[in-house]
């Protein structure tokens, strides 16, 4: 394939997955997806290798999908499927680490032959069980666990599955509506891909896939080779549930290879903050890419030079059936450990500590109209500063999840945002200051009782400043 054609096709793939994500968001029933962007979308070759991802999305979804799709391919190889088939799962140990994230995978066919896959992951507004949080002791308490199964078969909806979900979730219309939106996104992506293949007379994706993945791998290895060989370590303390936890990390650079080892980190706990390996891998590779190779496409090829190790049974490689609902309260701190280790060798490329763990606010109750409601939205503290710029205020990193506007919250629920304001001087001082945190005051416009669940961290251990900068506020 000549270089010009390759670049055109690569640009087309990026355009296609961005249209896939846009279609999903436009069709979504929930502010979690269409406003906060808690989703991912990507295209995969016939073997399940991730080729390209949409710009909109979160690392905890897109990087776990790179592994998750292979489980679908193993259980349902392309040659066993037909046009109109589509599959899904929310198994935390196959996907993105908790039951609220549902992955929908759809094969793409050209002239009756399977040529690739489109997949997306979205956060469901509800999945049954306990209210989303860290209070469960086992995953069985956290909601409905759907193994890999058909969502559509030859174009026919799996109504038994839909009936089970409707009977178990608090917001059935929103949950089922988003499944249709996810399917719509994949269908748009597949249609655009096939049109492109026909335009350029391409029979399959094998040649293009090999070029994309091999080039990404080589460029990533070249970027790693620019860092001096050695072992760089760090340790991060976080609140935990009832006692603090430690994340210990060693980053080994050896020529064109990189190994991350979390040996010595705290063991898994009896609360829902445990992290499955897929999620650990996702939030390890993302900050590494930010620091080492930000311009290189994020795909299966760029993952090849990086090995991630976490002992079985530790907080970062938790074993079934432990509870995992609030796994992000630990997993989002991996970027701080990565940057802490790399600050010893490439300090100009990393961020200081920030708030890290995404804030989840969920309210459940009965509205003034007598209807039950369950609503969740996300917020964040500040990002750490870099060596060249202030940290962003009220911005989620590393998740990239957007805060939901007060107007959007109030339009679809009886929740009222009484106050939302930045907290002065909450970011650490320095030549470049840390981003500011925020204060929120909420109310429910109903005389009937409501339940509030909030997930957060950074109440015991302040975010660290780097290169002589001051710590931020806990």
Residue ranges and their predicted role:
Residues 1-83, 88-110, 114-474:
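Glycine/proline-enriched, intrinsically flexible loops and inter-domain linkers
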């Amino acid at each position: 394939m000549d270089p010009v054609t390759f670049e055109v096709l690569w640009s087309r793939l990026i355009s296609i997955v961005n249209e896939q994500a846009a279609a999903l968001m436009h069709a979504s029933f929930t502010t979690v997806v269409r406003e906060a962007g808690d989703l991912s979308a990507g295209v995969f070759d016939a073997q399940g290798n991730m080729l390209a991802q949409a710009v909109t999305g979160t690392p905890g979804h897109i990087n776990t999908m790179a592994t998750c799709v292979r489980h679908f391919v193993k259980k349902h190889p392309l040659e066993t499927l037909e046009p109109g088939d589509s599959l899904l799962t929310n198994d935390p140990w196959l996907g993105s680490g908790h039951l609220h994230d549902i992955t929908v995978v759809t094969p793409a066919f050209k002239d009756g032959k399977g040529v690739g896959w489109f997949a997306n992951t979205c956060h469901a507004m509800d999945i049954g069980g306990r209210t989303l949080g860290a209070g469960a002791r086992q995953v069985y308490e956290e909601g409905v666990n759907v193994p890999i199964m058909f969502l559509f078969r030859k174009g026919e909806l799996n109504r038994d599955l839909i009936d089970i979900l409707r009977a178990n979730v608090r917001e059935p219309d929103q949950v089922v509506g988003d499944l249709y939106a996810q399917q719509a996104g994949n269908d748009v992506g597949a249609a655009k891909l096939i049109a492109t293949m026909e335009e350029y007379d391409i029979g399959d994706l094998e040649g293009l896939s090999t070029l994309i993945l091999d080039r990404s791998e080589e460029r990533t290895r070249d970027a790693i080779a620019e860092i001096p060989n050695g072992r760089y370590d760090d340790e991060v303390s976080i609140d935990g549930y009832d006692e603090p936890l430690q994340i210990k990390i060693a980053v080994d650079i050896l020529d064109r290879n990189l190994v991350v080892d979390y040996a010595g980190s705290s063991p898994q706990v009896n609360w829902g903050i445990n992290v499955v390996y897929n999620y650990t891998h996702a939030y390890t590779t993302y900050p590494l890419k930010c620091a080492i190779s930000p311009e290189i496409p994020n795909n299966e090829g760029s993952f090849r030079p990086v090995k991630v190790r976490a002992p079985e049974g530790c907080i970062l490689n938790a074993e079934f059936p432990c509870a995992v609902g609030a796994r992000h309260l630990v997993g989002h701190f991996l970027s701080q450990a990565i940057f802490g280790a790399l600050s010893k060798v490439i300090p100009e490329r990393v961020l200081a500590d920030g708030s890290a763990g995404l804030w989840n606010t969920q309210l459940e109750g009965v509205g003034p109209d007598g209807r039950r409601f369950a609503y969740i939205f996300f917020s964040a503290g500040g990002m750490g500063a870099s060596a060249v710029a202030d940290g962003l205020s009220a911005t989620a990193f590393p998740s990239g999840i957007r805060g939901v506007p007060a107007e959007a919250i109030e339009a679809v629920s009886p929740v009222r945002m009484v106050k939302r304001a930045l907290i002065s001087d909450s970011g650490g001082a320095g030549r470049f200051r840390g981003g500011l945190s925020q204060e929120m005051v909420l109310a429910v416009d109903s005389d009937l009782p409501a339940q509030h669940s909030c997930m957060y961290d950074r109440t015991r251990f302040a975010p660290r400043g780097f290169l002589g900068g001051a710590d931020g506020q806990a």
